[in-house]
Amino acid sequence: MQDVATEAAKRRTFAIISHPDAGKTTLTEKLLYYGGAIQMAGSVKGRKSKAHATSDWMAMEQERGISVTSSVMQFPYRERILNLLDTPGHGDFSEDTYRTLTAVDSALMVIDIAKGVEERTVQLMDVCRMRDTPITTFINKLDRDGRDPVEVLDEVESVLRIRCAPVTWPLGMGRGFRGVYHLHLDQVRLFMDREIIQGLDNPRLDELFPGEVDEWREQIELVREASDSFDPEAYLAGQLTPVYFGSAVNDFGIRELLDDFVEHAPAPRSRDAGREVRADEENFTGFVFKIQANMDPQHRDRIAFLRVCSGRFEPGMKLYQVRTGKNMKIPRATTFMASDRSHAETAAPGDIIGIHNHGTIIIGDAFTEGESLHFTGIPDFAPELFRRVVLRDPMRMKALQKGLEQLCEEGATQLFRPLLGSDWIVGAVGTLQFDVAAYRLQKEYGVECTFEGVQVYTARWVSAEDEKALQRFRDRNESALAWDGTGALAYLAPTRANLELTQERWPDIRFLATRDR
């Protein structure tokens, strides 16, 4: 058995980020195909066929063709172990994506050549920048007509505030797409017959493309002069991104991307948990960044997704749950290949394992071999939309409660129980989350319900240094207070003016829009 440092050095744990429809799920499929994890890369566009994308495993995702939960997939490639976290492609699921990005060491950004930098990409890059996450860029859909590649790179640099270092460069696009030129290897890789031609000055190119090759040579000369060259240190600091061009749906340009990625992407990095936790430490540490209910609808299971930060996990280990102060025996854990699960024999730093959860584990929980650590930077955000749950059949109240509690544990929606009355209020970042909640409550828990408007503008978690001040605030504002799903007290403001006035009246109370788990 190899030591922890050796195993950690093999790992590459990363997420793919993009705006919806940039080709993220298709690229995911191709990466898994290259890693030997799947036999057939099923195009997502064939949704009516059985070849649904491997990473979109939930029924609703297969129907709508968007990723709404984060899947975890492990696969080997060139003596490395890659852990790929697929993030939701829909904007309403930004919290799930944010937490996923806390569990990775680098990210792969996908951009559509026709659309350039889009809104969702900007939001995700803001999150990556907060953690100086190294970014690799794949500019997709070169088989279709799009914008000038130079213009798109300028946009990436100005809007996303990261320097670009092209590694491959497109030769034409759309119907005139001939292939890519690899700037480091001085190779032309042809699109149609996949031939590799060594050297941009090779006479073979003049034979094949007499009317185009001179223009390519001129353009690549300009690109070499005007763009940054790849600098590993700047990349690891999150300041520079290597850029690759290709067509994911045609399986072109991906091998070049993957070959370089496993060489340059960082192995598991140190983590802040009150002290610096290094990946090569012998003792096990890890944190929960996601909870998913009903990955197997037949067994009503809940899985806590845990990122291993140091040491080694082995089945049967006793782990210390820092929040509760209790030891928990973990008889077995799960590794993931999208929905296909297998029991983990062992897990090393950088790996993601699934622990069966019966309601005792929450997002942000740290597990160690006895040390009290708190991994920082796993937040909750105040929801932006609120709805009251209306149950069709009052006899299903118990099932509704169980369903809401389990689904809200996952973190895409948040549950609030007002101190007065018997309402259930659900908060979310976007309207799609309510659709997903209603769909899953019906499919997985047999509960039919609707969500109707409620007079809540926003929620703020409340706390105070002085316990008596908090009790006074609670006594005077009971009708606007609620417990959230973790047992934290929240103020549900009916209007913006009300929130501002309440904050003025109660200067001793902290009103928090985000809070660390």
Curated annotation (Swiss-Prot):
GO molecular function annotation: GTP binding; GTPase activity; guanosine tetraphosphate binding; translation release factor activity, codon nonspecific; translation release factor activity, codon specific
Role noted for this protein: Increases the formation of ribosomal termination complexes and stimulates activities of RF-1 and RF-2. It binds guanine nucleotides and has strong preference for UGA stop codons. It may interact directly with the ribosome. The stimulation of RF-1 and RF-2 is significantly reduced by GTP and GDP, but not by GMP.
The protein's name in its UniProt record: Peptide chain release factor 3
Protein family: Belongs to the TRAFAC class translation factor GTPase superfamily. Classic translation factor GTPase family. PrfC subfamily.
Short name of one Pfam family: GTP_EFTU
Coiled-coil residues: none
Ranges where the tr-type G domain occurs: 9-269
Localization terms from the record: Cytoplasm
HAMAP family: Rel_fac_3
Gene3D superfamilies reported for this sequence: P-loop containing nucleotide triphosphate hydrolases, Peptide chain release factor 3, domain III
Record lineage: Bacteria, Pseudomonadati, Pseudomonadota, Gammaproteobacteria, Chromatiales
GO-annotated cellular components: cytosol
Membrane found in the keyword field: no
